[in-house]
């Protein structure tokens, strides 16, 4: 018979073992066994003129040009002043996305929502005109709604102080200054807060990714410093916080495999996912492609993901074959497709007419087929690895960028696995 001391020792050891948490590498969300099929809630907590033009049209001074219209959220708030901007944005935040949208998202077979939010929701620079401190409550409510309908969430830091890319969707257009010291420090404060909060146990059943920063403009910024930021975020999450949330890093518009030597399993890292964004409308060459050329590019994009070291998801893509959507390129800039694009020294030439581009009742059967083909090819290519998140869930006026309208028009498959044009990439991979 075992002595009482031995029995007590065994009991103590069992208790200690049971009390020990599982290793982090055993607990994190497993993307290898999960195909992401999602939508972005664009134009909600970060304004984009092309998604909700009515918010910006109120500033119009004449019918001939866009003079006087703010071209991003920074200038929207600056033009209105703090009190009026707060009132208008609260109305927008409380109505643009509601619980009914999450029910609809779930009912169409999606499983994930990516929610963009700007740094200014949490902290401001001294001279910032943004409305701050209110967006977080809407984000948390959205996470609750997602949980209720069985959806997963990515929290996406979409705008950095000084802007990481100069795009209007960063909050501040036409400058790229987020790596300057003061801006950099504020952003790291915000990033630390977001990582800490949304890696807590109370969120990780639903929030399965925190994206460090949306679309840092790799060809312009200091890439070594961006890599340092990614390393710092990972170290803070894994070593300081000792938590297992997935860290999402954007590819910074670099080629596939660019981050294969950073934060890899071989280096002892885990739970890192690379976010790719694929559009084919932001150059004259792209909008001039035939449908077969567009699809060939898509198939190659899918093939490239097979060799990447990390999990990867196409976190933004669209059905757009033109850049005809009003203000897609920015307020006052025009479209490359019809030759009206003018920005600084860049101009464009006529490829085709934008008339009727967002009115499906004017489309020919061939045009409808081309859009359906393009969507189906992307669905197939991007599910070769870990999936996709469409940009975006809804817009006021445009069709090419609106998931809901595309579903209603029969251009986006329902169910999502339905194919009218199967095996388009079969010769590529």
UniProtKB/Swiss-Prot annotation:
PANTHER family per the UniProt record, alphabetical: GLUCAN 1,3-BETA-GLUCOSIDASE I_II-RELATED (PTHR31297:SF1), GLUCAN ENDO-1,6-BETA-GLUCOSIDASE B (PTHR31297)
Family: Belongs to the glycosyl hydrolase 5 (cellulase A) family.
Listed Pfam families: Cellulase
Protein name, entry field: Glucan 1,3-beta-glucosidase
Disulphide bond pairs: 299-425, 324-354
Enzyme class: hydrolase
Entry's EC annotation: 3.2.1.58
Gene Ontology annotations of biological process type: cell wall organization; glucan catabolic process
Domain of life, per lineage: Eukaryota
Function: Beta-glucanases participate in the metabolism of beta-glucan, the main structural component of the cell wall. It could also function biosynthetically as a transglycosylase.
Chief place of localization: secreted
Residues in the signal sequence: 1-19
Cellular localization per UniProt: Secreted
Propeptide: 20-27
Alphabetically ordered keywords of this record: Cell wall biogenesis/degradation, Cleavage on pair of basic residues, Disulfide bond, Glycosidase, Hydrolase, Secreted, Signal, Zymogen
Entry GO MF terms: glucan exo-1,3-beta-glucosidase activity
Reactions catalysed: Successive hydrolysis of beta-D-glucose units from the non-reducing ends of (1->3)-beta-D-glucans, releasing alpha-glucose
GO CC, any one term: extracellular region
Active site residues according to the UniProt entry: 215, 316
